[in-house]
């Protein structure tokens, strides 16, 4: 299955360019501009030392050799070489350290902003984006920006200055020969521009396929039990192989495009070198150049080739960096969920009302919810029943504002939920989902998630959830690590730990999506008792799967195709003989079987 990466998009109307990326990075660079300037100065010193080497060769060859050689040239040139090497080494170390300091500071800021925006986006973001895409953006792709800030900047600044210094020295030595070398540069620039556009497109497609490959691995790891039980190893291997081969194809196309630049550039440079040697030989016969001048010129010209090659090779990491920037700033620019009207809500009574609420996901042919209206009194328990796809989960997701209704109003204590501060509203709600989510932390931290653990309250919550004895038997008690998503706990323990978390929060409104996973009778009994304690005295909306839960509800709302088609108590709905009675009969027969 292919996923669409909606985070990665051009950063302006004309597409992503280095200048666009620089503009986005400027607010992060500006506070550190003094350090950046110092790094550029030290890189300039490094570049200047490149031109210093051939500059020392000329007097050495012209005046330091032979019986008539200058004694001063014999000694000051070697000493100057050592001095140049020392200055170059210190400057290179300083520039590398300063740039890495700047880039790591910016990397930290970007990573923190990305994670902060990710946790404050709406639920639609998590439905739209795969986990592998978000993980790649925050953990891996942001390092491409680090590569741009260090390696690419070093290349662009230091090697550009090196080329400028060397070309300046070449003009000083022999401007006629230098013009021949300069003729080659436009040809190199044309090659770079042609290769540049293709590399950018290939990089974008390559990184999209990398996310696809990560998604396949993520699905296979997460669903390993299904893979093994259904003998899906061959199918998953085929999926992975197909995507890996596509990824390899794009990698080879990138290698071909990126690899052409260097040999073509070197070929053009060799033509220039051959012409220079020919003309220099003619000039030397007319005493227009010296041996030292010729060697210094050829040395300078050869020294120009390496930084030019680096400047050309910078395209690939630069394009990867710009492609990564699209993903990074796509996440940073993702709109945050609305924070509400700012009205405080310190302690809700628990009164809930839906007034003609409708909702659709945009692509659906019919609304997921169609003009739903009902009212829940404080402390009342409402069970939601209905066939799969009837809108039960969507309905409960609207209450904590994971989504906002497309029409109608939801009220808590007589006030529209949009008027409340979002955090204040959610602080009045606890949720126990069908898919239990636990964090790779201690028992205590999972129970008190989002708050500072009070060990006495944690212990009380565990006792109410019938989990205290099991935790006490663990080697580290409350400090026991549960593993990734509670993998070190049994299914019943995971469910009861999620219930303990809701008990610890002690919110007046409870949203419960009962788990349908089969448990042994002992675990089922413990979970059911914990749920009953959890629901005591709380306004509860429960998507009920157990007959016992449905039967003890104050009212049952039966949904079908996004509408409430029946409402009443368990006995009333059975007597009515409608959809609920039909669903009840099917479930009763399944349980009896």
UniProtKB/Swiss-Prot annotation:
Residues 37-320 form the ABC transmembrane type-1 domain. GO terms for molecular function: ABC-type oligopeptide transporter activity; ATP binding; ATP hydrolysis activity; ATPase-coupled lipid transmembrane transporter activity. Residues 352-586 form the ABC transporter domain. It is a multi-pass membrane protein. It catalyses: ATP + H2O + lipid A-core oligosaccharideSide 1 = ADP + phosphate + lipid A-core oligosaccharideSide 2. The chain crosses the membrane at residues 33-53, 75-95, 137-157, 164-184, 262-282, 292-312. Signal peptide: none annotated. The keyword Membrane applies. One of its GO terms (cellular component) is plasma membrane. It is found in: Cell inner membrane. ATP binds at residues 386-393. Keywords: ATP-binding, Cell inner membrane, Cell membrane, Lipid transport, Membrane, Nucleotide-binding, Translocase, Transmembrane, Transmembrane helix, Transport. It comes from the Bacteria. It is an enzyme of class 7 (translocase). InterPro entries: AAA+_ATPase, ABC1_TM_dom, ABC1_TM_sf, ABC_transporter-like_ATP-bd, ABC_transporter-like_CS, ABC_transpr_lipidA, P-loop_NTPase, Type_1_exporter. The keyword Ion transport does not apply. Its EC number is 7.5.2.6. Belongs to the ABC transporter superfamily. Lipid exporter (TC 3.A.1.106) family. In MsbA the ATP-binding domain (NBD) and the transmembrane domain (TMD) are fused. Involved in lipopolysaccharide (LPS) biosynthesis. Translocates lipid A-core from the inner to the outer leaflet of the inner membrane. Transmembrane domains (TMD) form a pore in the inner membrane and the ATP-binding domain (NBD) is responsible for energy generation. PANTHER family: ATP-BINDING CASSETTE SUB-FAMILY B MEMBER 10, MITOCHONDRIAL, ATP-DEPENDENT PERMEASE MDL1, MITOCHONDRIAL. Homodimer. This is ATP-dependent lipid A-core flippase.
